[in-house]
């Protein structure tokens, strides 16, 4: 990463996009700070998994991060209620905040429950057809499948690491409907 960041420092781009896994995100933020690389915008992947705001605090401030879910989104359902309730319940049960993978897995169970109920059967064709006809909202987001099986009704979330003193948090900045 150091060689790439040396080039970034010399070229002075307007945006640096870092995509990789957890270790790569942590390494990038650490080395950007150590090497005093100044870019107007840093966009990254894997910020949630890397716990970027907690691991690197102010060094990660203003990093823009794509994610599948954030607890502050206002989607609702009858089982988990909303993201904040899900977050509190999950944290109480497991001792840590839920990553988006836990949230999407919980939402998937709601989708299957709904499909089984609508199919009123365990017949695989009836269940498959019920899944294909899914159009519902969960605490995780809207669920509606395209012909190819993709959920086409839930946007990605973009958050930015924001710090107030030494406390750094992920704040949703897009979609603007949920910007904090």
In which residue ranges do the predicted regions lie?
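Extracytosolic ligand-binding ectodomains
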Residues: 1-180
């Amino acid at each position: 990463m150091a060689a790439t960041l040396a080039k970034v420092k010399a070229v002075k781009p307007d945006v640096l996009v870092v995509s990789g896994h957890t270790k790569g995100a942590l390494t990038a933020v650490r080395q950007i700070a150590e090497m005093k690389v100044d870019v107007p915008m840093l966009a990254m992947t894997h910020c949630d998994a890397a716990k970027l705001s907690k691991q690197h605090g102010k060094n990660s401030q203003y990093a823009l991060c794509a994610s599948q879910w954030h607890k502050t989104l206002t989607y609702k359902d009858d089982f988990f209620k909303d993201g904040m309730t899900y977050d509190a319940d999950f944290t109480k049960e497991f001792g840590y905040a839920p990553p988006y993978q836990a949230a999407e897995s919980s939402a998937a169970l709601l989708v299957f429950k709904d499909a089984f109920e609508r199919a009123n059967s365990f017949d695989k064709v009836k269940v498959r057809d019920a899944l294909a006809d899914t159009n519902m909202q969960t605490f995780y987001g809207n669920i509606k499948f395209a012909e190819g099986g993709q959920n086409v009704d839930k946007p990605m979330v973009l958050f930015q690491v924001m710090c107030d003193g030494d406390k750094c948090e992920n704040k949703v900045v897009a979609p603007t409907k949920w910007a904090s």
